[in-house]
């Protein structure tokens, strides 16, 4: 069996050494070289033709993002960003995913052990290789379509940045009209006014979520999201989405009450579920082992939703490797919720949605574009 050829690019000799040893000690991987900067890396990519590259963002002579952009344009290879990204640089990690990085892994820091990070990197290298052809073909196709549209929207959004504040104020006024019919409906069955939208995503999800949320507006029910991401990245990702969308988008906090028109992104490194408190739905953050290799796990979110929100849920499972979310989606469907899996054509990695379809967990299979209308319709229904 051919081994997966890996090139390690990092300006730190220590990191190169640690990663090299980890790669060499895995029976499925072959370390074909290391590089201290993008210029050396470029030559080695041409000469050695690696299957997967690990790349640091902060490097001398050329930063990792510029290099990533060039590689994805001229010589696309799955690239995993391995970087000690501080809070202020998290935007660079989000940008890397937009530019086509397969995934992002945080270097060991704080309570995160070296062993845990190494396991994560090895897992991601294998996953990226397994998905290589499909991922690169999809990336090329989608970067031409909705990523270029996103860029246009971002440019327009920066001009109309102030518009959001005005819209939010009006949205707030319109968000809580006192409606006696609503109240009587609410009292007759708490469930009927508790509409909720839940979304799960992994590889390719950052771009998919940007696309969804830049195309949604208006008075939608609360939206809860699990996007697989390392701790500390999710806060910055939520900020970024918030800048691009007229919806209020934030990182979820434990025990906060869900509001209409607000999107709650699960923090990295901890599971998110929902709990009911006096008729209100609240965020429940809790620790625990990884589920389907993930924390936060989509299954954990969907599972808790199936218990507390019953049939008043629209749940969408987007692009991503593996099968996290498929079982949870089935539970929501069995409780009478409406479930949607992303179609193969619009998914960068068709793993999680495919698993859901195999489990017969999806009421509907839809493109990312159609999901916008499904969400809007559900919000109005």
Placement of each model-derived feature along the sequence:
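Conserved sequence signature across two-component system core domains
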Residues: 9-10, 35, 53
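Conserved acid/base catalytic micro-environments in cytosolic active-site loops
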Residues: 2-4, 13-24, 39-40, 46-47, ...
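Conserved beta-strand positions in the Rossmann-like core of class I SAM-dependent methyltransferases
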Residues: 7, 32-33, 340
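Short hydrophobic/Thr-rich beta-strand motif most characteristic of the beta2 strand and flanking loop
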Residues: 28-36, 44
